[in-house]
Amino acid sequence: MPSRLPRTPLAWALTLMLSACSSVPERPAPDVPESWFHAVREQPADAEALADWWQQFDDPALTQLVRRALENNRDIRLAMLRVDTARAQLRQARAGLFPTFDLPGSASRQWIENNNEPNPDSPIGEFVPDDDVITFDSWELALQATWELDIFGATRARTDSARQQIRSAQAQAIAARLAVASNTAQGYVQLRALEGQRALLVEGIELAAGLERIARALFEAGEVTRLDVEASAAERASLEADLDELDINLAKARLALDTLLAEPPGSTAHQLTTSARVPLAEQAIPAGQPLDLLRRRPDLIAEAAQLEAAQLQSLAARRDMFPTLAVQAAVGRSGLALGDAFSSASNFARLGATFGLPFLDYRRRSAAVELADVEGESAYLGFQQALAEALEEVERSLVRIDGQQRRLTSLRTTLRHRQLAYELAQKSYRLGEANLNEVLDAQRGSLQARQQVLQGRTALATAQVALFVALGGGWEMDPNATQSIGGSGL
């Protein structure tokens, strides 16, 4: 049988080097549809309208609130601090590409017991002091430089990874701004909706009180029973109870806006008037194409940057399996002294190099490669999930807007009929042709219809805000500042 060649250390090293040469795993590009499934009509995205989408609602109070929130919100400040952290990490990684300079120094003294008798005939006898204790001093001061050459690019890969982390942090900061703008707009819409509900309840209470007065007058005239008076009074009291609960929710909505704006409690209540309606964007919102999300949505840009950073870390882990070469150089001065008998000082210079070849590390480096690959796969799955959720958000918003627009039209038609029925019931009751229950039912129907129209308008405004945000609106995109997803190793 042929004998097997022994595995020499060099063979093991070459095996490790060959395994390190394997490329970073390639992953397929994301599957993005060409058009929106629920789009009413295809229109290119309006970048200018998306950048300041809150102005599309034509509400100066909303525009002012969003701008103040973007200037003062604490979540945005925290996100910007994370950008500064990423920049510091880049400086730290990039420093590995350059030499390091140190100014080391040392000094020491030794005390040696002298038990020997002086010997004048010894060649060094004249330099050896005859003290009982001999002191030996040494010192050194030097300027030292060390440079690990990045021959195979491991440090460069980590530096590029840190750059992608900055890109991710910047995108996350933009995403934080978009979230603040969205929450502010949603909070403002809810506030105006609650104010509208309050106005309806106040009007309903006034109508109920008027109906109660009519019932009392008719009762005193003997035309109706006491039951009509008590029923009308109960209706008024029920509406007043609803008003008390609504005032609590209204206070909560105002306080939530104060927190978003990073202002003291009560600021919003003092600054906003109560006469505004729930704002709506009257113009249609062009959704563009699904592919636009990859350039507009900051969360997708952040995920793509995280994926690119993970790919570069995987590449760096593979490059760590290659040999290393470092150069050291030093210049300085050193000195020696032997008690009072002898002293000397001189200049020196050193130049050297160290070479390292991975040999036996119990699979530490290969485990680092496996870990980097797993993190890369996690980043890839995270990007895919974020993209799927982004597509779902846009489709869901398109469905909501289309449905809420049709629903609002139907609710307005219902309101016209309810109001007419209430007017007819009031006239009939005054003429004695209808009983109080019919009037109360008509009043409840009219109030409920008006509330439903308000709720439908609120739902449509909320859906419009959600679509603007889902499309990545709220910032001016710099095409030179964002890389394509194809550059993320997909």
Q: Whereabouts are the PLM-identified features?
A:
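Outer-membrane beta-barrel proteins
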Residues: D75-I76, D228
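Short loop-to-helix capping motifs
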Residues: D59, N72-D75, E148, S182, ...
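Amphipathic alpha-helical coiled-coil segments
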Residues: L78-A93, A176, V180-E203, L207-A217, ...
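Terminal intrinsically disordered/low-complexity segments used for targeting and assembly
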Residues: P2-E71, N119-E126, W139, R163, ...
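Charged, alpha-helical scaffolding/interaction elements associated with membrane systems
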Residues: N72-N73, A221, L431
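Acidic, glycine-rich loop-and-beta core segments that form the ion-binding/anion-interacting portion
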Residues: F219-L315, R319-F322
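Small/polar-residue-enriched beta-strand and adjacent coil segments characteristic
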Residues: L65, R87, L97-A175, A284-E389, ...
